[in-house]
Amino acid sequence: MKKLLISFGFLLACVCAWAQGIGSYSDLQAFIEACNKGESIIQWCNSDTVVVLTADIDMAKAKKFVPVKSFSGHFDGQSHRLKNWKAQRGLFSEITKRGVVEGIIIDASCSLNATSKGEEFYAGFIADKNYGLIKGCINYGKISHKCGYALSNNNIGGIAGYNRYAILNCSNYGEISSDVSGVNKEEVFIAVGGIAGGGAGKPKYASVIAHCNNEGAIKVIANLASIYAGGICGNASRSSLKYCDNRGKISADIRAAEDGSTKGIAKVGGIAAQTKNHILRCYNYGALNAAGECGANIGGIVGIPHESLVIADCINYGPVKAEGEQPSNVGGIVGSIGRPVHVRGCTNYGEIRFDGVSSRARSTAAGIVGNIYCPKSQKAGAYVRECVNHGSISAGSGGNKYDGSNRNAIHVGGVVAYAEARPDLRASVANCSNDGKVSCASGRKGDVIGNAVNVKTGGAAAQDYAVAVQPKADGTNIWGSVTTSDGKGLEGIVVTDGRQCVKTAADGSYSMTSDLSCTRFVYLSMPSYVEIPIREGRPQQFRRIPHDAKAATADFVLQTREPAKEYKVLMIADPQVRPYGWDDSMERWDDTVAPDAEAFRASCSGDVYSINLGDLVYNEMYAWDDYLDVAAKINCPTFNVIGNHDYDQNTLFEIEQGNVFFETYVGPEHYSFDLGDIHYVILNTIMYDRPSVNDKYKYGLDDRTLEWLKADLSYVPKNKIIMLCSHHNPFKTPNNSKHGSHNFHSRHYNEYLALVKDYKAVYAWNGHNHQNFYYNYANHIGKDTKHGAPNIQCISVARATGALRFNRPIGSKGEPQGYMVMNVHGEQVDWYYKGVGFGKDYQMKVYSPARTGDDKVKANIWNWSEGWSTPEWYENGVKVADMEFTPGIDPDYYDLFATYDNQTNRKYCQPDKNCIMFSVEPTPGATSGEVRVTDMFGNTYTQQVTL
């Protein structure tokens, strides 16, 4: 009994030690002191070793508060508040790479009054500098910053002064003001943001600010060379900004320097003043104003992006105005662009005005982008695509002495005011629309573009949004109809919000109740008896849900047709393009693969479709526009699949931070349609919700996709054939191990296998592996595997543009650039690999002994698989022998690779040592021969060789 009592007492002591937490200011002081001395903080941790607040903390006694100097643990405020705190710096001076701080609320009774004295300075209520993760923190306190003479940069933010890693789900409601004087040096600036003042870091650090909002007013006055004032982040640098919104008023007053110079520039943005990384799905409601004795670049979303990047799916609702005494650029989305920035799918509703002075140089005002220019050093131009302006645009005379024919005049445009590029670069302002009023007291104005030089223009924005309405009394918040052009309802068509599926009624109507906080689209599963609506080659079976819509209605008008029983599908894998001028990938996609596919399509008498199996671009998100432009040259409906390289490679924590590019440029990431008798399912099997940059993405289906797949297939009878198309095969992929590549470890494997295992047949197509591969489970279950199902066949397709980063006419396995051609005859399916520049008969390359150097004939049969015959060697029309499987390196590719001297890229495109090679020793004295092989569909291919 005594031992039992001792053990119980010890356990109770441990529980108390692990569960104490921080419940008072004295506890907080003790915790901070222990941190700063490097002592144990276990007594303030819970059982998960997380430091926790257990109550609101009254900070009234904190007269000379000393913050945590450096924190590498996990701190959870559990939504408790810090109250009555008169701060001079943040709670944490620095959160390290391993640090996590969450759930702290700074009460409105708190204030931060910071004074810097010339040195580099950082201040934010939660952290002065963040190298770790801050999430779920809220600030209501006021921040006031002053600096009498800045010699170095100052960074002030509501949550963090500076961010190098991640800030998620944080809010600022407190007013932030900064008044700075200093030296007039270009490198000295003040950066102020509602969430973070500044950001930095290389792209590999995956720095991000996401799902954050600011409602606090921001006011900056300075006489420095640069002011950065942003609703979310001042100078975001390498921090990407996603799913953020600003409702706070932002004003910047940039004054002349001590020597009277007015060369300073105010950069002001509703989301960021300046950025070197992407901004997606961000929204500004706040009024923006730039004034003072200097000029400004001011935009509803960002003042000036300063790198090759994408700004997409953003909306500005707030008024944006520049009224300084020097030339300025004003835009509803972006003030000025001088880099290969791609602005896509953005909308402006705000009033845009230039009311400043611009006597000797150009000033601009426009609904989307004020000014686009192209420095001599640039290798690519800017794109503005699929953007719409509804706001009024105006500019005063500004004392400008030039007329509209002069580039230094004031320019005003509904979409872009002034756009200039070089004739040797691609640049465009295309597929954009304006219905706002455009007025200019002097200079030049245009309904869409004020002036364009060496810039491609034309087209109108897609009408692909549902209409925002109020919910119905029963809570229904998505509804509409599917009809023919004469108004006849189409019954039985499946409609989805990406999770649930419903069928249209007899009159073509449908309705559902959806979680609009995470619903991006309402779309159709296209039946085989309607024409697929396309725009520039892409199916338009969807409507985008408007931002902040409480409910939405979407009507679809379709044209009926007889279902096609016979047709062809081009299975194109991994174009994996980078922008023009990088590594020839875009060039090969443009000048070899796409033209070949279009020529093949044109030679066909029946319907042709294309399914592009992911890795459409290669990490560089601003390649999307050009990829799509080239894909549209294949004049048939093209169904796109998302791959791992189609994600922003900095994606962390949630898939939605990375797939937003695909959704913006293409549409839903999972969807279905019928062609003839077959049901096609497009899936995202790449799970990019990794917890850190050191983790890899995973394979499988996320919860939302699985829910949708179950709903979609509930309307598909089991006697149908299913064609699953994804980037990574959900079942079997090439692997040296017989049992190591069945993907049973993938997320939700058992669930999605159960959904498809009883269908008549399932063909699972994929890219990703950069090689041709076939596997039929019916030949293996019960023999060498227990996974999969006997109705499943897996087909992998080689990279269309050749070896990665090399992009030459043949790939690392010796296969020509190319794609699979799938022939469909009712329910009968066959396929073959079509090399670029070759016909169906070209299925192998045969090398003579003189070429191989070992007295043997070798044949590389790049699409050979189970079900094919053993290749046979013929001499003088007589079979001599079966050839032996001898995997090895393709001689032609080996020689081609030897000419490649890019040491950085060579490791990505080494000759494959396991090419599908067969060999035979010819009869002595033979002068020629022939290799014959028959594929699984009974097609015999021959190739002759001179010995």
PLM-predicted stretches and their roles:
Residues 527-535, 539-550, 621-717, 742-763, ...:
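Extended active-site neighborhood of metal-dependent phosphoesterases/phosphodiesterases
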